[in-house]
């Protein structure tokens, strides 16, 4: 019996130690991470402005996340003792910060023996970026829906104004339209539930196609109308999102794959496309 209790308490001590650290250290094993903050150009600091939705991707590490509304983010690194995740190979890794209508920002971090290599300029030993990541805007987009609030008995068209601001002298985009001798007829709207990515209605014209168009500085206004009665939208709050993809050659193929295949399609996959936009509220009472 004495030997039994000796073995039992020996096992208990070993089990507790393993829960703390496999090498009987003082610190508990926890998920390692890289943290930081992002500030968007032409957006006020939080809480006056929102910096959420920035796509953060660590190239070569296979991890990604998005920023919270205050611009903060956390990339969870694989645990050092988790063989299923694979070891982090020694070397430098690039963290990409992406929005479709902002310039890509990058931070390079280094790993050695599976650990973050800290330095005085980039990252702390705890994995916190020492500087705020700033992202410069390529173009802005604000959507105005008229009327914004639909009451009982309304049976007219809903008008959507899309104001595009081009920060460089020229930006090329892809959008849905019909080209005629008299000009262009624009279409291509997603109407989704405001509190989810559930698609409620698509505004489209059968003969419209996705076409490339240049947006000269200072910008352009697009007008799109659709028949409210045919939408059959139920009571609720919605967000109206114009289909628009910024034409750019600086996006790595791996970054596109990390976002999700088909993000540039005119369907619900478009909701995967990280893009900073404002407005678009539609309330049906």
What are these regions (language model features)?
Residues 250-285:
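Short beta-strand elements
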